[in-house]
Amino acid sequence: MTSAGVAPTALRLLTALLLLLVAAPSHSLPLLTRGRWIVDEATGLRVKLACVNWVGHLEPGLPEGLNRLPVATVAHTISSLGFNCVRLTYSIHMLTRTSYTNATVAQTFARLNLTEAASGIEHNNPELLDLGHVAAYHHVVAALSEAGVMVILDNHVSKPKWCCAVDDGNGFFGDRYFNPNTWVEGLGLMATYFNNTPNVVAMSLRNELRGNRSTPISWSRHMQWGAATVHKANPKVLVILSGLQFDTDLSFLPVLPVTLPFKEKIVYEGHWYSFGVPWRTGLPNDVCKNETGRFKSNVGFVTSSANATAAPLFMSEFGIDQRYVNDNDNRYLNCILAYLAEEDLDWALWTMGGSYYYRSDKQPVKDFEETYGFFNHDWSRIRNPDFISRLKEIQQPIQDPYLAPGPYYQIIYHPASGLCVESGIGNTVHLGSCQSVRSRWNYDASVKGPIGLMGSSSCISTQGNGLPAIMTENCSAPNNTLWSTVSSAQLQLGTRVLGKDGKEKWMCLDGSKSPLISTNECICITDSHCYPKLNPEKQWFKVITTNKQLLHQLQL
């Protein structure tokens, strides 16, 4: 029954939202692309992929950790932490070599002398030991389906082993272990095996193409061949294409575009890690600006509305040592979180598992710890709950162009906490939920002006160095309430304040006393202000324009 107080447009939006909420837990409908977005084929509404990688491409031929926990427990943990998707890795040899196709999980673990791991599987997942490897994968995918988790099947390697080295024989078409015909055969088999599996929503063709054989022309020929093979075997799934240079380069696409007829199923992917970049020793704002610019130029451009062939970009790998002991990782993380939030990309964290059954490239080869994993070494707890909490806001769509076309407003995202600037009780300003009505602001970051709370006459003001930021209604004051982005990375919000010495200084919003937001003298906005050990990242805030207001009003 229609309420007399509900406008027809709002009612249609509410109906669409309810359809989305009903569909979301099962993720059972095929997906397709519309411009730069991934959408539900049935409703046309956006679906954001917030995934975690689950490694299964190594020598044992089984997704990791099933010696530690029942598969249902792993699946429900993934879901409970806010991930709606798993990028599940596999090897081509698992599908094409008799050493795997004619073997059970138990036989492969025996061949690798993984007696202790096999004993753990017998305790936690006894039904897996007598299954073949592909059947075991089916079992894992089914458990993820029961937990409402979508799956992306990712061909990581041909020969099962750790990835990636330039010369490991798995890098590019024609390498020692990378026979293109066998690769296409394996893709077709995997697509066929999972053809009637609703929660398998995408297949990624190959991880981190690399090496001396790499050329854009060879990439174009082989990747389109693989994509066509997958689409023919399973036309429902999205087909994800990785780039060159360890999945950091798609810059050749404007001159060598993909010409497949099923454009609505094509997604591109990119990787971004801290490796080889002076995050710890360089000027933080400059390093973040330069690395963000590099990624946008080489990969991120595919989503641009200025690009006639705009398509979704899936950040299929990013991650850090989750112990927070690596300064390079820690500084990179704040930069990439700001980028992921601003661009509202689909993404997959590397990684889930806290250890591996067997890694031939490491010592010890058995039970090697993975400090990038969100589980700890023995999978008994979450390694770093604070890190996981920082992902919560970017697990949600920030833009929803097909449900809520407007009005637009701004959120002010703080990557060091994963929270947003929120107006509190009284005149306080603190870090809180990005979904809150009181975290919606009117602010044009391109000009100097007030940061006004949407629907009110109040704006943010500074009281001085080291003091809490406050809300005020005196929003036309020449200082204290007029804010600008003041660093090369465009991540610090500062206002000019007259000091006791009669000189003006820049005061920046600062989240170092989280959840309270204070204002402190801006750090590192110029080279001369950034001496060793100064780190401005608690002052990093990203202003993001969003249109989620209608969505959240309807949910209320």
From Swiss-Prot:
Pfam families in the record, alphabetically? Cellulase (PF00150)
Q: Gene3D superfamilies attached here?
A: Glycosidases
Write out the PTM section of this UniProt entry: Glycosylated.
Please name the GO terms of the biological process aspect recorded for this protein, alphabetically: polysaccharide catabolic process
Active-site residues are 208 (proton donor/acceptor), 473 (nucleophile)
Report the SS bond pairs: none
Q: What does this protein do?
A: May have glycosyl hydrolase activity.
Protein name per Swiss-Prot or TrEMBL: Glycosyl hydrolase 5 family protein
Please report the organism this UniProt entry assigns to the protein. Answer: Chamaecyparis obtusa
